[in-house]
UniProtKB/Swiss-Prot annotation:
Protein name: Biotin synthase
Gene Ontology terms, MF aspect: 2 iron, 2 sulfur cluster binding; 4 iron, 4 sulfur cluster binding; biotin synthase activity; iron ion binding
Source organism of this protein record: Ehrlichia ruminantium (strain Welgevonden)
Domain Radical SAM core: 40-258
Binding of [4Fe-4S] cluster, residues: 55, 59, 62
Cofactor binding comment, as recorded: Binds 1 [4Fe-4S] cluster. The cluster is coordinated with 3 cysteines and an exchangeable S-adenosyl-L-methionine. Binds 1 [2Fe-2S] cluster. The cluster is coordinated with 3 cysteines and 1 arginine.
Subunit structure comment from the entry: Homodimer.
Catalysed reactions listed for this entry: (4R,5S)-dethiobiotin + (sulfur carrier)-SH + 2 reduced [2Fe-2S]-[ferredoxin] + 2 S-adenosyl-L-methionine = (sulfur carrier)-H + biotin + 2 5'-deoxyadenosine + 2 L-methionine + 2 oxidized [2Fe-2S]-[ferredoxin]
Names of the cofactor(s): [4Fe-4S] cluster; [2Fe-2S] cluster
UniProt-listed GO biological process terms: biotin biosynthetic process
Gene that encodes the chain: bioB
SMART domains in the cross-refs: BATS, Elp3
Record pathway: Cofactor biosynthesis; biotin biosynthesis; biotin from 7,8-diaminononanoate: step 2/2
Length: 322
């Protein structure tokens, strides 16, 4: 199995990985993971929604879209003091990276100062900072970099071919343009996708291929399992199988050996055994907290119990004491 860093993957190669016998695939992914990371250490990330609901985009999976009746109450931007308290709590809980997100289409210039203030608060606690704020221009990205932003999250969700089955208010090229702006501003990219949208295995392969063939691999690759939301067009989508989800984790690890592969949304429905296999297959980051934006997340005490049983350490030892 090749362990070099590549940006020239071809679709037949990626499909071949997806079609490997399961044990061979996850073993190869695990061996690559061990070469680039401590396989018994995991990154813990926290996530705060600074603006909830009312998003003008029509992403068919999202509870925050204004296009659907999801019973979600629209909320204004959080005040800085509330955010400051959340950051301090995250620090006490042993979080490594503090991420914040807003339900809007793109960053507005009038909000730059507010966003930069949040970044400064995060950095003052010696935490990594990550923002997920929609489309971003190069000029805006440079301002966020100057403020100290470490990561910017902008998921591509799925393959280019399947994309318009998911969202029509923003193009695939819009997403790639924002990723390019983030990279040019020398901010680390955080970008991944969602499984269970109705996509094929080839779509999953193409999504990972797009990320792996960027000029710089994303430093973080969140892999989400669809959490069906009542009132959205995808509320009745069938659940992706555990095996297929783990396969995708493994292929992501093989294609992007130096990236953090994050278990993101949907983890609350995963057994300890499934999560253990995901970690073996190369996942080495997870979101911690009882809520991810508007959807439930795994129980905090349950996470500590799982990692303790597996002998997996976190970067911050205080995590197990909080």
């Amino acid at each position: 199995m090749c362990t070099s860093i590549r940006h020239d993957w071809q679709l037949p190669e990626v499909l071949e990985l997806f079609n490997l016998p399961f044990n061979d695939l996850i073993l190869n992914a695990h061996l690559i993971h061990r070469k680039f990371f401590n396989s018994n250490e995991i990154q813990i990330a926290g996530l705060l929604n600074i603006k909830t609901g009312g998003c003008p985009e029509n992403c068919k999976y999202c509870s925050q879209s204004a296009h659907y009746k999801t019973q979600l109450k629209k909320e204004d931007l959080l005040n800085i003091e509330t955010i400051k308290e959340a950051i301090k709590k995250a620090k006490v809980n042993g979080i490594d990276r503090f991420c914040f997100a807003a339900a809007w289409r793109q960053i507005r210039d009038r909000d730059i100062e507010y966003i930069c203030n949040i970044i400064s608060l995060i950095k003052s606690e010696n935490l990594e900072s990550c923002a997920s704020l929609g489309m971003v221009t190069l000029e805006q990205a440079k301002k966020l970099k100057t403020a100290g932003l470490d990561f910017y999250n902008h998921n591509i969700d799925t393959s280019r071919d399947f994309y318009y089955n998911v969202t029509t208010t923003r193009s695939y090229d819009d997403r790639l343009s924002s990723l390019n702006n983030i990279s040019e501003a020398e901010i680390n990219i955080c970008s991944g996708g969602i499984l269970g949208l109705g996509e094929s295995i080839e779509d999953r392969a193409k999504m990972l291929l797009t990320l792996a063939n960027l000029k710089k691999h994303p430093k973080s690759v969140p892999i989400n399992r669809l959490v069906p939301i009542k009132g959205t067009p995808f509320e009745n989508n069938p659940k992706i199988s555990n095996i297929d989800f783990i396969r995708t984790i493994a292929v992501a690890r093989i294609l992007m050996p130096e990236s953090y592969v994050r278990l993101a949304a949907g983890r609350e429905s995963m057994s300890h055994e499934m999560q253990a296999l995901c970690l073996f297959a190369g996942a080495n980051s997870l979101f911690y907290g009882e809520k991810l934006l508007t959807t439930p997340n795994a129980d905090c005490n349950d996470d500590k119990n799982l990692l303790s049983k597996l002998g997996v350490k976190t970067k911050q030892a205080v995590f197990f004491d909080s």
